[in-house]
Structure formats: structure tokens, C-alpha cells
């Protein structure tokens, strides 16, 4: 297995072997929620009743400037949502994050690295022990896959507004489960023969589109395609057969979609200006 580790990870996070390879990008993914709790009677409002906070103390070893370790106590206050990260006179804010009960990420990545075909790799990836990331896969048999991976909470309703502060005084907003592997957006063996992703949502990983956003909850991911992804998709879409050397050139491409759309208008505006400096800029 060859590849690179991600910062802080003692395993190959992006890699390849004699049979297949994979890479990751950041998926536009909401795997956490910040709940606003109403403080009452030393606890917090919960439906028509109230609940007390759970309080525990942990001991941490902290290395000082002199290199000596000292023991510090940290008091953690929790609601049913998760730990309290902020509190004022009337409200407290609790953070709920996916992945707290997924301790087998090392096993998953070892299985991915040892896989010899698509089925073996997919079996490993379907464990979803990594709470986020898009996975882009290709193998020597010509199979390709885009997986919008990680753990996405099964929310009762709503859209991307869950990215903001969520009312925490009702059981109706508290999610318990996450979407299964089969429920996540993915494109396997795209008809176009190519996939791309540049830290953007999964809907335009290939063109023509093979994912319909309406088949998924509105909170699954946002709906946009930024300029970097547009440039990536354009290069693949406009080339029927990409050679390895072309692929390397596309990888290092510095042309900007935004510039292509604005330069002509900017030059025209500069040339019509009374500012001689802008005339020089337009000439360049």
C-alpha cells in the first residue's frame, strides 16, 4: 500500500495498492448540531417538564512551559444532547456530534488498503467509521465510485438551516440515528466514465447528472457548484478520452472559471475609464 496520511492519523488515509486506489475530499456535510437550551430550576426545559444536567469531572495531564506535567480537573456539564459548550444567564448551548460511538476507523482503513476489488472495498467503506469525507474510488478493472460518506443524522424534518442553532427545549429536534450506507448519495460506474469533486456537494460529481437531489432529504447536503468544481467538471466533460499526461496537466491547471466570465467585461470597463493606470491593466 502506498499513499499519504492525514494530519494526526497513524494510517494511510489516501492511498493505492496493486488493484485500486482512493482519495478523499471534504464533503459539504452537517454532522453536528448546536442546541439552545432554556435554563430553568438549575436544569433545562424539556418539553412540558425539565431535566437536570449531568455533571462529571475528568482529570487531564497538562504540560507546562517548564516541561513538567501537572494534573488539572475539568468539570463537564451535559444535557441529553451532549456537552455544554457555552452558558449565560438564561440559556445554555449543547453540542451534538456524530462519530462518538465509532471506534473502528483503523480497522476500516486497513480493510480498504487490503481490498483487491470493488466489492471488498465497498464492504470496508460501508462501515462508515469515518464520520465525514467524500471518497473517490477507482480500480484497475475500470470501476469508479463517488461516495458521499460519513454519518449524517436522521433529522425529523427541515433543510440546511440545521447548520444554525436548533431549539433544544423539545424532544422533537433530538436526533438519535444516522443514515445508513445505502441511504447516502453515491455514484457507481458513472455512464460518463469520469467523476470529480472539489470539496463540493455530490450532485454534480459527473455530467450529465446521475444523482437527483430530490431523492434525498433537504438537509443531506447543500445545492451549489463553486467555480473550482465547475472548472474540474468542464475539463473532464469536454475531453472524450483523457490520456495520463492530460490528466496530469488538468491536475495542475490554473485557469479560472471566474476569470473567463469576467475578464472581457473588466477589460471593457478599464478601457472606457479615464484612469490611465486601468488602461495599462487592460492592455496586459
Model-derived regions: residue spans:
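Mature extracytoplasmic enzyme cores
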Residues: 1-283
Amino acid at each position: 500500500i502506498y499513499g499519504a496520511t492525514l494530519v494526526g492519523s497513524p494510517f494511510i488515509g489516501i492511498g493505492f495498492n496493486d488493484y485500486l486506489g482512493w482519495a478523499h475530499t471534504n464533503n459539504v456535510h452537517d454532522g453536528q448540531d448546536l442546541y439552545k437550551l432554556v435554563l430553568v430550576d438549575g436544569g433545562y426545559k424539556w418539553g412540558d417538564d425539565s431535566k437536570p444536567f449531568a455533571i462529571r469531572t475528568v482529570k487531564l495531564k497538562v504540560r507546562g512551559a517548564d516541561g513538567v506535567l501537572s494534573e488539572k480537573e475539568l468539570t463537564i456539564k451535559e444535557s441529553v444532547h451532549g456537552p455544554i459548550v457555552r452558558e449565560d444567564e438564561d440559556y445554555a448551548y449543547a453540542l451534538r456530534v456524530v462519530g462518538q460511538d465509532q471506534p473502528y476507523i483503523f480497522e476500516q482503513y486497513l480493510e480498504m488498503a487490503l481490498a483487491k476489488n470493488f466489492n471488498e472495498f465497498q464492504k470496508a467503506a460501508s462501515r462508515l467509521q469515518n464520520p465525514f469525507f467524500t471518497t473517490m474510488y477507482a480500480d484497475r478493472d475500470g470501476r469508479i465510485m463517488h461516495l458521499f460518506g460519513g454519518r449524517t443524522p436522521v433529522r425529523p424534518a427541515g433543510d440546511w438551516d440545521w447548520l444554525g442553532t436548533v431549539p433544544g427545549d423539545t424532544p422533537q429536534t433530538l436526533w438519535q440515528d444516522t443514515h445508513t450506507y445505502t441511504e447516502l448519495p453515491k455514484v457507481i460506474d458513472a455512464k460518463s466514465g469520469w467523476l470529480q469533486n472539489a470539496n463540493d456537494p455530490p450532485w454534480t460529481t459527473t455530467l450529465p447528472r446521475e444523482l437527483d437531489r430530490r431523492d434525498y432529504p433537504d438537509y443531506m447536503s447543500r445545492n451549489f457548484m463553486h467555480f473550482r468544481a465547475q472548472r474540474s467538471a468542464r475539463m473532464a466533460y469536454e475531453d472524450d478520452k483523457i490520456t495520463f499526461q492530460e490528466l496530469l496537466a488538468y491536475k495542475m491547471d490554473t485557469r479560472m472559471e471566474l476569470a473567463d466570465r469576467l475578464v472581457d467585461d473588466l477589460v471593457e470597463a478599464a478601457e472606457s475609464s479615464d484612469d490611465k493606470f486601468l488602461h495599462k491593466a487592460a492592455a496586459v
